[in-house]
Each structure stands twice: as C-alpha cells, then as structure tokens.
Amino acid sequence: PAGPFRIPKCRKEFQQAQHLRACQQWLHKQAMQSGSGPSWTLDDEFDFEDDMENPQGPQQRPPLLQQCCNELHQEEPLCVCPTLKGASKAVKQQVRQQLGQQGQQGPHLQHVISRIYQTATHLPKVCNIRQVSVCPFKKTMPGPS
C-alpha cells in the first residue's frame, strides 16, 4: 500500500504511538480555531530562534502541544514526517466529517485542511526535533511553498 508509510517500520511506530493521539488533537484544535489566538504554526508569529536560545521557551507550550512533542521525540527521526502525515490525514478525515455535518464544505473546508498541514509541517521545528526541521507536505499547500 502506498500512502505515507512506504517504510513499514514507520507504520508500526505510528500504531505504537497510538497514531500520535496528542498531535492529532493539537492539529485539530489549531485547524478549527482559525484566526484566533496564537497559531504556533507560522514562522513569523513564532520565533523559533529565540526559543532555541531561551531555555524557558518550551515550558510555554500548551500542555497538549507538549504531549505531541513528546510523542514525536519518541519516533525515530526517519519516521517523524511519515507519522505526522498519517496523523494529518486522520485529522483531515475527522474535519471533513465534522464540517460535512454542519454543511460547511467548500472553501472553508479547504482552508481548515491547509491549516492542518501547515501546522503539521512546522511541528518538528516547534518541538525542537534536531534531525527534522520541516516536513515537506506539498500536496495541500496553497500558494508558493
């Protein structure tokens, strides 16, 4: 089977990590609260460099994000992006169902989905995973990447 798990080991890690449950919740939360509060996703709003320098940085993460980072740190670097992609896909399906029930498909759905991937793309960086900085999810990224 194709999909994000061309590396069988990563599929196993994804299952062991309970499909990155905290990351899924985090992605879902970020995508749904569009435009409110700090988004933790976009480079310009969140200066990673300061965070690296500043030992207090990581403590300011919301607990859910911290849990998600812990999940990612347990993955092998090789599997971080594939497992995140798996998590993003799962969230995308949840969102599609949720918005479908509310009759909100179309542009709004696209917007939310692009936020899921945008958030996921930067998670390794937000979580200070040394070997991975940004996951190359190109497919659903609108505009120039």
Swiss-Prot record:
The cross-references to Pfam families, in alphabetical order and at most eight, read: Tryp_alpha_amyl (PF00234)
Sorted UniProt keywords: Allergen, Disulfide bond, Seed storage protein, Storage protein
Q: Does the keyword Disulfide bond apply?
A: yes
Please name every pair of cysteines joined by a disulfide bond in this record: none
Which residues get removed as pro-piece?
40-54
What does the UniProt record report as the effect of altering R6G in this chain?
Answer: In 1.0101, 1.0104/SIN1, 1.0106/SIN3 and 1.0108/SIN5
Q: Name the residue ranges with Acidic residues bias.
A: 42-53
Q: Is this entry keyworded Signal?
A: no
What InterPro entries does the database record attribute to this sequence? Answer: Bifun_inhib/LTP/seed_sf, Bifunc_inhib/LTP/seed_store, Napin/2SS/CON
Q: What is the effect of changing T41A?
A: In 1.0103/SA2S2
- What is the top-level taxon of the source organism? Eukaryota
Effect the entry attributes to changing R61K: In 1.0108/SIN5
| Outcome following mutation: S36G | In 1.0103/SA2S2
Where in this protein does the record put region Disordered? Answer: 34-62
SMART domains linked to this entry: AAI
Mention one GO molecular function.
Answer: nutrient reservoir activity
The observed outcome of changing K138Q is: In 1.0104/SIN1
Function according to Swiss-Prot or TrEMBL: This is a 2S seed storage protein.
What family does this chain come from, according to its entry?
A: Belongs to the 2S seed storage albumins family.
Assembly and interactions? The protein consists of two chains linked by disulfide bonds.
Protein name in UniProt: Allergen Sin a 1
Q: Which organism is it from?
A: Sinapis alba
